Amino acid sequence: MDIGKKHVIPKSQYRRKRREFFHNEDREENLNQHQDKQNIDNTTLKKAEKQIHKDSIDKHERFKNSLSSHLEQRNRDVNENKAEESKSNQDSKSAYNRDHYLTDDVSKKQNSLDSVDQDTEKSKYYEQNSEATLSTKSTDKVESSDMRKLSPDKNKVGHEEQHVLSKPSEHDKETRIDFESSRTDSDSSMQTEKIKKDSSDGNESSNLKSEVISDKSNTVPKLSESDDEVNNQKPLTLPEEQKLKRQQSQNEQTKTYTYGDSEQNDKSNHENDLSHHTPSKSDDKDNVMREDHIVDNNPDNDINTPSLSKIDDDRKLDEKIHVEDKHKQNADSSETVGYQSQSSVSHRSTEKRNMAINDHHKLNGQKLNTKTSANNNQKKATSKLNKGRATNNNYSDILKKFWMMYWPKLVILMGIIILIVILNAIFNNVNKNDRMNDNNDADAQKYTTTMKNANNTVKSVVTVENETSKDSSLPKDKASQDEVGSGVVYKKSGDTLYIVTNAHVVGDKENQKITFSNNKSVVGKVLGKDKWSDLAVVKATSSDSSVKEIAIGDSNNLVLGEPILVVGNPLGVDFKGTVTEGIISGLNRNVLIDFDKDNKYDMLMKAFQIDASVNPGNSGGAVVNREGKLIGVVAAKISMPNVENMSFAIPVNEVQKIVKDLETKGKIDYPDVGVKMKNIASLNSFERQAVKLPGKVKNGVVVDQVDNNGLADQSSLKKGDVITELDGKLLEDDLRFRQIIFSHKDDLKSITAKIYRDGKEKEINIKLK
């Protein structure tokens, strides 16, 4: 809301202040009308004061002028108030000291009033005898009776006025006034209210004023002059009105303390009261600064909104007191009051004022302590909050400065980190893919090699069937096992094929039917066979180029757990070319073989163990390594309940030695020592005693028969000798004896034997040729 002079306040705030201003003026007008009516009834005044502020247009104009002047003065002193903030604290301390001084001054005044009371008692006797005093007292009684009739209404009005004045406005509830800066003003207002209460007691208030007035003719003209000055003064602004109110309160307080001293003191106080209606510029400035300091120090108050209701209440109170003083002085000029009654009323009113001042000082002291502690706590909380905000601001400023100084480097660093993370993820993904590809390639290569070796081996493995006569007396299942087997083409010379198979596969037949992987068949001839090694060689002719000879490996370098493939023809031609996979389960196994199926073991075969699946028809099949090279020939398997995948193959190095002799000689020449033997484990106790065998001997053989002129006879070996070791090897039974002797078929050198003869141990050399 624009109120002129470049002052703008909110419209709602303007309306609220205007409403309060008009309410206060209406209340003041009603009060003045009531007072004028009372004065007319009491014939103390000849005419009532004229009504003021009756025109609503003048009200609006005066309110705007007063508010704009106050805001202009306040805005002009805002900067000065900041500089005077420290000074205001000192003023509060001085105000506190001034309160103590006023308390001492009141006590002094009380002493002076006591002395005046004593003088009054002395003059009491003289006044009783004075006729003039009697006439005055009679007149006083008549007029005081009239005043008592009006006193109830006056007291009632006084209470109503006090209630209206003490009622706080909405703006007063929101505004907090600094107690230190307005301490003196509040003291003066409290004392003035006490005087008002005393003045509402009818004749007592009028007698109080008449006590300090000695010359009626001099007093009445002065009061009329003061009335004219008040009526002729120009409208005051809000700061000026507040300044005037405070000065009047201070002067009234000073006058109250000086009642009863002398007539001259009363006149001087009255003149000072009238002279103080014109404020000085310096005092006006101090009051304005104090008022602005009160408004500025209140955090809940709007900086552009003064406490109008409070100012109007104070101004109204001052004007009311001033009007009452005029009424009382006019009443005193028209009445004659006895000195005795005046002094007694003055003494009672003085006591009331002193009690009110003491109570007010105590209350102000308590409020001062409470206000001071509250201000200190508020300052501490505000300082802590400001420190916290300053710390947060400092941190944010440091971060901003750091970012502004180094943001290019930080951006580059973040970019490098992100690039490293991305490259690392890419490389890890590539490496992972490479490893997966390598694994896949390795698996594919392994699978491809295995399949390649299997396909090549299949081309070298054939089906071998002997030509068993139709009138064979063998059982059908027995004949089928002997008649069908597998063979391996270990050598190819032109169209001639050399096939190795098992001796028990070819049996006693010379001709064998050979069927290739492409289902073509030829007839092969048995070149030789050896039952002790269970190997045979078949020769066949074929121009089929699909038949390949197998690559030969080395059985001396076998490794336990090495992967192997077994290729054969289980159950005959229908399942030819079957490939099974396994590993080498054992090395250097001694396997008992029963060739003639008489339930007696005939040979102790040296072989290696495999776990690949071997079925009837796989005999004579090929065992190849991962490179597809032949490392053994399938010879036997254990067929027992609850036994699976325990098969045996003859090492390829032993096979090569046997097939070479079978190709050229058709047979194998083994050394023949010319003896018959029994196992020690099969001897009974009588037989052990007969050969005088020591009890510690558990294994070995006993020579049961020696051929004449045989190698054993030539070696001095006799019947009854017990052989426990041969060629440095522990001898378990006769099969082990035959195996050791046959192992020297190629060199035929003499071997050492440890024997027991007639219970005595000795060694002899056995000749093999």
From Swiss-Prot:
A GO CC annotation given for this chain: plasma membrane
A GO term, aspect molecular function: serine-type endopeptidase activity
UniProt keywords, alphabetically: Cell membrane, Hydrolase, Membrane, Protease, Serine protease, Transmembrane, Transmembrane helix
Annotated Basic residues bias: 1-20
UniProt xrefs under SUPFAM superfamilies: PDZ domain-like (SSF50156), Trypsin-like serine proteases (SSF50494)
Transmembrane segments: 410-430
Basic and acidic residues bias (residue ranges): 21-64, 71-108, 138-186, 264-295, 310-330, 348-362
Listed SMART domains: PDZ
Cell compartment(s), UniProt: Cell membrane
Family: Belongs to the peptidase S1C family.
Protein name per its UniProtKB record: Serine protease HtrA-like
Organism: Staphylococcus aureus (strain bovine RF122 / ET3-1)
